[in-house]
Every structure is written in structure tokens, then in C-alpha cells.
Amino acid sequence: MEFFKSAFIIGGSSKVAYYICINLAKNGCERFHLVSRDLNRNKDLIKYLKNNYKVIITQEENDLLLNNALKNNSISKIGSYDLYLIASGYLGDIDLAQYDAYEALRIHTINYSNLLPWIIEITNKKRVNKKGSLWVFSSVASDRGRPSNYHYGAAKAALTTFCEGLLLRCENKPFSIRIIKAGYIDTPMGKDAPSFLCISPNRVAKYLMRRPFKRGIEYLPWWWLIVMFIVRIIPAKLASKL
């Protein structure tokens, strides 16, 4: 199967998206559209791609907190790309979210509810009957609610369940759904995580390139499957300390 020639990236200014775009270009991707909250953060990526590869890059500013996809008809710009990537995410202020409804809703909005207009349009009836792929970054946090990050985990769990439904809907379609349950990644969002548990965003990108047309749910790195199995089955008294 021919490699992706075009990619539509939501969360284009994230470190993970940065390295995925570079690795896509290395493998022959020629056209990119970056959706980001702050377009200035895309400058380094755009400069690198244009200097090293013959690519076409467009971008648009969109804040997932404001749901601009519906307000300014941004979803009409989605078009037909070979790969759609959702790499956006917001951990938020975990302590504040326990008592502040605004921060709690901010976490749920950015990580799930305001992604829905995009995902629904990406997987419209016409598009899923053609070849293409949707990669969605979820999180191992979605596997069990824990005191340390249950708002973030709940939002990612909702995203995972929704996309799992899409995965099954597209089971016999040429369009593939790939749900990535990522563990700790060495990015600003994962700055407080133990370093020995972190994987670099470049390694994440290289791993995804090994099987670009893969369908299904996967843990990244793979050993998080074992870790989260243990987390899911431990008694509540122990889980309350996580």
C-alpha cells in the first residue's frame, strides 16, 4: 500500500506531532495541514520541513477550548487527506480541577467534547468508504480512574470509547482507525513523570511508522499493557494511593 501523501494534524504544535510530521515527510508525505492554538509554535517545524523536504504546508488557528470548528466552519476545510492525526491534549491543573468546575470542564472540553465535530466530519459516510487513516492519541490514564488525574483520565476514556465505536464501524471499510494509548512521553505535558517511564516523542513517531496502516487499540510503549492490567485489577484501597 502506498504511504500517506497528505496529513491533517490537530494539535500541530505538540512535540509528538512535530516528530510525526518529520517522519512522515521522510517517508514521502508531501502535504500537511496543521491545526493549532498558537501558530507561532509551528514556525520551527515549518522551517525544517520546507528546508529539508519538498512539501506543501498550510495551517489554521483553532483553540479547542472555544469550539471554533463549529463557529467558523473550520470543519469544512478538512477535505480528503490520507492521514488524520489527533495529537492534542491538555492535562490541566489536576488539584484545581477537583474543586473548580471551570478547570474541570476545560480538561474535558479540550480532550474530548470539542474534538467531536472534527472526528465526526473526518469519519463522514463518504470518507470512510475510501482509503485513509485516523490516528487518535488517547492515554493509559483512560484505563482506570485514579485520584491523581481522574478528570484527564475520564476525558480520555470518553475519547477512547467513542473512537472504539468508530473502529468497529469501520471494521470492513477501507478507512482505518488507530487508537494509541500512550504512556508518559518526554514533553512539557509529561514533565513531572519519572524519567525512566518516559519515551521520547521521536521514538513514538518512529514506532508508529513501522506499521502505518495498523488498525485497533495499542499501548505505547507496549509494556504499558501489562502495567495497566495490574493497575486495573488492584484493590481500591491500593488504587486510591495512585
Residue ranges with predicted function:
Residues 179, 194-229:
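C-terminal helical subdomain
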Residues 13-14:
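Conserved glycine-rich cofactor-binding loop
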Residues 139:
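Residue(s) in the substrate-gating loop at a strand-loop-helix junction
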Residues 85-93:
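Conserved NAD(P)H cofactor-binding loop of Rossmann-fold oxidoreductase domains
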Residues 144-150, 193:
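Active-site loop immediately N-terminal to the catalytic Tyr-X3-Lys motif
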